[in-house]
């Protein structure tokens, strides 16, 4: 009886993901919808496995991977140098794989007459150099900025790739997830926001031009797949070491044709061109 009690006590205090048949996936809010669909479909044919999915942002997922509280980190960005150093210090050997492609779409209200923007204009909008739609050929109305919180991989990617490392304008309203950004733009005729292409409903996309003389490109699956859309990116799973056991079975399934079908059905772009 004492031995049984001791075993139960140990199990109660083990991290949840240590238990057999349980996998946790935590991180990117951009990827939550994808991870939920992948988990649901996988568990239909693997009834002995429980996959728990949560968001919180790429930074939170990476921190959870490093501290051992999640088995799979979903991230819309790579690790920073600082995160890599902490991982090494903690003895975490980060294993990286690309599970899908995505484009960062620029969201506008459906009634906004603006059709396209250059990368330079985007930078100037989000750093407060351009503050009125009339400066872009639109109506004389203020541009209302919406973005993501700084624990978001999308925030980090946008700041690095579009703003060139500059800070966002102080008046940019940070929102906790892509769905919140879409909701804000749908209800603000003067708003502009950014986020993944899988989330856009009730709003419209702006075409993106590399420069004034370039052709505008919309964030379609085809344009993300061939990288003609200027703000295309990879979506990652990070693990501590190469996957084994149940985790490997799940990862192999995600990368299979069955998993890629779920990627497409969820509104994301498969790694392998169709």
Predicted feature residues:
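Sec/Tat signal peptide C-region and signal peptidase I cleavage site
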Residues: 14-20
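Sec-dependent N-terminal signal peptides
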Residues: 4-14
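Exported/periplasmic ABC-transporter solute-binding proteins
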Residues: 20-274
């Amino acid at each position: 009886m004492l031995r049984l009690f001791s075993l139960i006590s140990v199990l109660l205090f083990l991290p949840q993901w240590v238990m057999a048949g349980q996998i946790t996936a935590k991180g990117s809010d951009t990827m939550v919808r994808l991870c939920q669909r992948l988990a649901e479909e996988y568990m239909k044919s693997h009834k002995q496995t429980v996959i728990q999915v949560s968001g919180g942002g790429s930074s939170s997922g990476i921190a959870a991977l490093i501290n051992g509280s999640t088995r799979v980190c979903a991230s819309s960005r790579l690790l920073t140098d600082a995160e890599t150093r902490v991982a090494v210090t903690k003895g975490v050997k980060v294993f990286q794989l690309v599970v899908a492609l995505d484009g960062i779409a620029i969201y506008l209200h459906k009634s906004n007459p603006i059709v396209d923007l250059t990368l330079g204009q985007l930078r100037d909008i989000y750093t407060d150099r351009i503050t009125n739609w009339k400066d872009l050929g639109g109506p004389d109305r203020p541009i209302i900025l919406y973005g993501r919180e700084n624990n978001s991989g999308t925030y980090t990617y946008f700041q690095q790739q579009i703003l060139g490392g500059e800070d966002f304008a102080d008046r940019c309203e940070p929102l906790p997830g892509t769905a919140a950004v879409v909701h804000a733009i749908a209800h603000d005729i003067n708003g502009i926001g950014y986020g993944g292409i899988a989330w856009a409903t009730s709003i419209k996309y702006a075409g993106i031009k590399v420069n004034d003389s370039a052709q505008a490109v919309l964030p379609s699956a085809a344009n993300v797949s061939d990288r003609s859309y200027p703000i295309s990116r990879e979506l990652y799973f990070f693990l501590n070491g190469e996957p084994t056991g149940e985790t490997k079975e799940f990862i192999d399934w995600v990368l299979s044709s069955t998993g890629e079908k779920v990627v497409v059905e969820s509104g994301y772009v498969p790694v392998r061109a169709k």
